[in-house]
């Protein structure tokens, strides 16, 4: 999609949403609520400003809804569960029509969502499923299992595992154990890689074996923190890669972890070139995209979160207007209480050779921003 087409599409979406929305809107600064009437208020709860993607997600959705004539309250919770709960309670007290929630801990929001239900406020889980509550009306996300599968298939192809090549040294990482998506990411990748671990074509020198269904949590990085991933990779390299032993591939579920892992590799003397480990990622964050261009990261799975925001804006509009909310998956996402109707968007693999065609020509980044 060209940049001009992308801009026109966004304008068209906003115009479509605005067609029957009459509420005035006020520009929201940082995380404060907008002023004006709350008759068409939409609450947006994002987990943190510390990751680039959540800043982009929140700003894009907020902008779309405001252009459509809705009043918004956009809140960031600094990755603190109690703070997010308080923010949601405050939003509910303002009588919103819909809450869009990207949760920090998908198991902690049951009581506050019960308050939302009693106030007749509809809830859309944004990208992260909210578990253990019957009061989640819809879920919008990318195909998270496919994200992991694409990472696993990339490793499989680049190492020639299907052709019987190996053994190779693998170090697996998983996302934060309190994020429901992390399990889908890991399982998607592990379903591809596990047979090669069992056959000995992939060896895990650190001993981080994944045998049971919940064992992925043993390699999880709490809060998706780059510095924690870096420290963990440092520990594995120092403890298990001595005497000339080298790591060949690192399964990283997202870019924030990959950033820390790349820093660890660099500090231990790994340099871009034929022997540099395969390193996966997700989100196409700016620093990681630059690392891909510099051969310090092999790939990223790009989830164009603008399209996620576009879809959620349509869902919000349908709810407010009493229309039919579009979903395309009514079977997969069981939150322990109910199967939540979901809309899944497709992720895309990005490598060095197609950064320009996929990320620049789509308008996601400018060439100048990437140094191209």
Question: What label would you give each PLM region?
Answer:
Residues 3-6, 23-372:
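A residue-level marker of the well-folded mature domains of exported/periplasmic proteins
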Residues 16-22:
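C-terminal motif of bacterial Sec signal peptides marking the signal peptidase cleavage site
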């Amino acid at each position: 999609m060209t940049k001009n087409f992308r801009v026109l599409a966004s304008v068209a979406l906003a115009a479509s949403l605005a067609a029957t929305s009459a509420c005035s809107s006020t520009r929201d600064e940082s995380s404060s609520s907008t002023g004006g009437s709350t008759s068409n208020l939409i609450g947006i709860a994002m987990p943190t400003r510390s990751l680039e993607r959540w800043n982009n997600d929140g700003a894009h959705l907020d902008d779309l809804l405001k252009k459509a004539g809705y009043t918004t309250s956009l809140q960031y919770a600094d990755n603190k569960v109690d703070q997010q709960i308080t923010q949601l309670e405050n939003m509910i007290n303002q009588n919103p029509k819909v809450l869009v929630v990207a949760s920090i801990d998908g198991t902690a929001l049951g009581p506050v969502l019960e308050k939302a239900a009693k106030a007749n406020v509809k809830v859309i889980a944004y990208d992260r499923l909210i578990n253990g509550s019957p009061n989640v009306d819809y879920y919008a996300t990318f195909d998270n299992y496919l994200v992991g599968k694409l990472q696993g298939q990339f490793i499989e192809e680049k190492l020639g595992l299907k052709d019987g090549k190996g053994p190779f040294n693998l170090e697996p990482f998983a996302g934060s154990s309190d994020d429901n998506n992390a399990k889908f990411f890991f399982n998607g990748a592990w379903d591809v890689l596990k047979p090669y671990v069992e056959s000995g074509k992939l060896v895990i020198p650190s001993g981080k074996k994944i045998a049971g269904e919940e064992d992925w949590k043993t390699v999880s990085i709490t809060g998706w923190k780059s510095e924690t991933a870096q420290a963990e990779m440092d520990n594995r390299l120092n403890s298990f890669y001595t005497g000339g032993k080298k790591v060949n591939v690192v399964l990283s579920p997202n870019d924030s972890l990959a950033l820390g892992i790349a820093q660890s590799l660099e500090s231990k003397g790994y340099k871009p070139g034929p022997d540099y480990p395969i390193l996966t990622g997700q989100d196409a964050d700016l620093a990681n995209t630059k690392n891909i261009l510099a051969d310090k990261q092999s790939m990223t799975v790009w989830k164009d979160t603008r399209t996620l925001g576009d879809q959620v804006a349509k869902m919000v509009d349908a709810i407010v207007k009493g229309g039919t909310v579009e979903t395309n998956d009514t079977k997969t996402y069981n939150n322990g209480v109910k199967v939540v109707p979901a809309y899944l968007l497709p992720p895309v693999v990005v490598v060095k050779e197609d950064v320009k065609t996929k990320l620049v020509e789509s308008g996601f980044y400018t060439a100048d921003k990437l140094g191209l």
